[in-house]
Amino acid sequence: MQTHEIRERFTNHFVNAGHQAVPSASLILDDPNLLFVNAGMVPFKPYFLGQQTPPFENGTATSIQKCVRTLDIEEVGITTRHNTFFQMAGNFSFGQYFKEGAITHAWGLLTGSVADGGFGLDPERLWVTVYLDDDEAAEIWEKKIGVPAERIQRLGMADNYWSMGVPGPCGPCSEIYYDRGEKYGKEGGPVADDNRYMEIWNLVFMEKERGQGIGKDNFEILGDLPKKNIDTGMGVERVACILQDVENVYETDLLRPVIDVAETLTGTKYGSDNTSDIRFRVIADHSRTGMMLILDGVTPGNEGRGYILRRLLRRIIRSARLLGATGETMEQFMNTIMDTMTPSYPEIADNRERIMRVAVTEERAFLKTLVSGTHLFEEAATSIKAAGSTKVAGAQAFALHDTYGFPIDLTLEMAAEAGLEVDVEGFDSLMAEQRSRAKADSQAKKHGHTDLSIYREWVDNNPTVFTGFEELDSQSKVLGLLSDGAKISEATEGQEVEVILDQSPLYAESGGQLGDRGQILLGDTVLDVHDVQKIGKKLWVHKALVANGGLAVGDEVVASVDKQWRHAARQAHTATHLIHAALRQVLGPTAVQAGSMNKPGYLRFDFNYTEQLTPAQVEQIQAITNEAVDTDWAVNTVETSLEEAKAMGAMALFGENYGSTVRVVEIGGPFSMELCGGTHVAHSSQIGPVALLGESSIGSGVRRIEAYSGLNSFNYLSKERALAEGLASSLKAPSEELPERVAQLVDKLKAAEKEIEALHRQQLMAQTADLLNNAQEIGGVTTLLLRVKDNTNAGDLRTIATTLKDKLGDREGVLVIASDNAGKVPFVVAATKAAVARGAHSGNLVKLVGSYIDGRGGGKADLAQGSGANIAGLESAFGAVRAEIEAL
């Protein structure tokens, strides 16, 4: 039975039983604490936690969820049961049926006849486990289902009691195992041999409330839940392994085709030895996981999800090399795994080209460094062993990472294969030093000095109270003054200083929003604030010029925000949120923010996406954004707990460190809801027009949109309109006809250029006919050493040389033709077949000429070309060529 049929039978079984079929969620959810969806119940957590009401008609649902677990990537292939990507088929009940219903449903599907839509498993080969004290489940299995008592085994909390690891719902579980037979191990059930007895289904009975505690079995159970729920998970790949009667999950119809392709590409047979088999399984597993991650929008990177994907793809590449592959292999692996997975995930077909491009690009980038990096490691390993050591120094591991892009995980793998350890502490120390230097450089740029310890007393004792959400002018006290990184007691006119206030309405740069501009006032004293930076998350540092008067520590002042600056900054920041929401509408939920910067009237927004946006997509994003502006939605903010914000549906960015209290900015209800600490307009209409300037790539898998907002947008659009009107006037055409008229002009220009090029070539050929008259005979070789008219390009020189060579026919002939082209000296060398037979070699002659004119080049024996920079050396070069021909 093929895997896609197993999936269909599972879904049909539960739909026929009244469950609502729910499509698999993306592997990427808006949860900053979750790298990937790693269990079938994850998308249903809000319903189990009581944060949302289940929207399913009968209170029951079924899904086959994509899952990725990457805790033990290096163990993949060593064991044959576990995959980094797997499909978890589940049925869920929210206060409807409980233990008996869950057990009956699972047993009916597993043992039901194939003709009736079941899997047809032999009931005599099924074993079950229950929690130690769960007499109810044990009785259902024995009395209602008919499983003999000797095939029902009881296990403790660590094995058969489920919780989320935090306070919340929990309960006992019951697992179903399949006996694969005596060839796989000893008898005695799952407690005796979990290799012979394969777990295929876990039934979780959520009936209790978990309290605080640590681990799987050390927590308090507080009492019963008001509603009892069911969460089950059947391993699709494991059931496929059983129904297809293969040794392990790697030999099912989903993964074995990749292994077959790997055999062909590497010349190594699967099953020949254990080490090779592990590498084959790594290729198969990681190809599927990598492909599915790219499908859901992950791109290779150096941290978070992108780092996991990069690590998987690079392990594929290295495993293929170790098996004997010599060229690129990613295209074949990806094509194969996409073929096997498309029946279950039809969306792969529409994303095939994108998936291939991301994977192959990563392969080509890594192959450039793999050979040299591996060679460096092998040299290091040899010298380490020769010195009687068993440890790779942290500096050596750091060099591999810093110079060749080797992740520490790859170095650890290579070291283990060589019987060595790695000084991970030393590596981490060097990485920390590098980060510290980068941080110091950044601090120096922001503060003019790198020593931030000078701020410690204020950070610890007098953090700044930010008042800028409530007011734009605040009564403040000067707590400190600094100049050139040193504390001072007073500041005088003309001095550049940093001012520490007890409270401030000026926004400090963070979250992509630049710091406010404004003033600090005391009588006639005026300090112009041109930047505000944060130290940590608590202290505001106002960088200011004393424009008039003086200021001392302890003075009572008024801190005032430049209202025009703040208004325009608010416009840009709120526009950033709208553009983010519009992007996700147009491109899908994987277009996640990767960075942003907004300042008055301008914003840029970086997002994870591998494709260049089409003009139509850019226009659609702009239209959705401006429609949101025009709708005049209220911009609401609320401070709440992180858990409550997530329950509300607020978007959080993976990898960000959020405090226990967060600020949610909501625009248009579900249209945009993000965690954000920045300043915003009160209504979306206050943003004014938003004009997208375009989008571009700023790195692998990251693109950038830039836009104007408010008055800047109006001015930009006015200039664009004036430009269009001027062009329309010049072309004597209405504006709406400009694209067509410009296209016509471009076509005419191209036609004229082709005509000019044809005339040029005709003239060139006419001149070429007489050039052989300048040839001389040197030792029986017709030799033409010629500088043609200036600004003849390399292509034309090549045409001249090949034409003249053809004219020489069977004669022995050598041609060297050069030109002075705006300070560069392109040149071509050609030799007839007869001259080559005598010993002439155009490639060698190119190198000879290049040595006289500060140039280089190369090519074949009959034709080569090069370029130099010293036309004055050309005659000497010709003389050297004559000498070479005389010596033939």
From Swiss-Prot:
Consists of three domains; the N-terminal catalytic domain, the editing domain and the C-terminal C-Ala domain. The editing domain removes incorrectly charged amino acids, while the C-Ala domain, along with tRNA(Ala), serves as a bridge to cooperatively bring together the editing and aminoacylation centers thus stimulating deacylation of misacylated tRNAs. The keyword DNA repair does not apply. One of its GO terms (molecular function) is tRNA binding. One of its GO terms (biological process) is alanyl-tRNA aminoacylation. CDD domains: AlaRS_core. It catalyses: tRNA(Ala) + L-alanine + ATP = L-alanyl-tRNA(Ala) + AMP + diphosphate. Its cofactor is Zn(2+). Binds 1 zinc ion per subunit. Keywords: Aminoacyl-tRNA synthetase, ATP-binding, Cytoplasm, Ligase, Metal-binding, Nucleotide-binding, Protein biosynthesis, RNA-binding, tRNA-binding, Zinc. Its EC number is 6.1.1.7. Belongs to the class-II aminoacyl-tRNA synthetase family. GO terms for cellular component: cytosol. This is Alanine--tRNA ligase. Catalyzes the attachment of alanine to tRNA(Ala) in a two-step reaction: alanine is first activated by ATP to form Ala-AMP and then transferred to the acceptor end of tRNA(Ala). Also edits incorrectly charged Ser-tRNA(Ala) and Gly-tRNA(Ala) via its editing domain. Gene3D superfamilies: 2.40.30.130, 3.10.310.40, 3.30.54.20, 6.10.250.550, Bira Bifunctional Protein, Domain 2, Threonyl-trna Synthetase, Chain A, domain 2. The gene is alaS.
